[in-house]
């Protein structure tokens, strides 16, 4: 199944609320949903920093659970969901998504990573 098909399934099932496929230079090549005030480039910039400081997006603070160059998992302790990212393995970019709190952060990462693996250059 293609990236677009699997992404549509993840959105329909409620695993993803908002998502962006970003190049390393922060060009948006795909997006789904909208989040007023959210800037995916801010998320990517914070992800690339070595510090484990919280990420604030559109006024919401997300605490970092795990962060490596290939993986970002953060959660809002107030129950406002998760910011999750995965570096694409077959494309020079990143898939960054907001996932609702009803999806656990590690499950959300699993979904996002599988999608990121489907992205082709």
Swiss-Prot record:
Keywords linked to the UniProt accession: Actin-binding, Cytoplasm, Cytoskeleton
Entry similarity comment: Belongs to the Asgard profilin family.
GO cellular component, as recorded: cytoplasm; cytoskeleton
Gene Ontology MF, one: actin binding
Top-rank taxon, per record: Archaea
Compartment(s) of residence: Cytoplasm, Cytoskeleton
Database matches in InterPro entries: PFN_sf
Function: Binds to actin and affects the structure of the cytoskeleton. At high concentrations inhibits spontaneous rabbit actin nucleation. This strongly suggests this archaea has a profilin-regulated actin system, and actin-type genes can be identified in this organism.
Protein's recorded name: Heimdall profilin
């Amino acid at each position: 199944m293609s990236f677009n098909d699997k992404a549509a399934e993840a959105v329909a099932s409620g695993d993803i609320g908002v998502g962006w496929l970003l190049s390393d230079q922060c060009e948006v090549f795909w997006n789904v949903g909208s989040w007023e005030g959210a800037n995916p480039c801010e998320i990517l910039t914070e992800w690339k920093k070595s510090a484990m400081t919280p990420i604030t997006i559109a006024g919401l603070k997300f605490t970092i659970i795990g962060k490596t160059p290939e993986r970002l998992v953060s959660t809002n302790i107030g129950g406002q969901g998760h910011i999750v990212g995965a570096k694409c393995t077959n494309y020079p970019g990143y898939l960054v998504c907001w996932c609702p709190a009803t999806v656990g952060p590690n499950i959300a990462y699993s979904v996002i990573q599988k999608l990121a693996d489907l992205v082709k250059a």
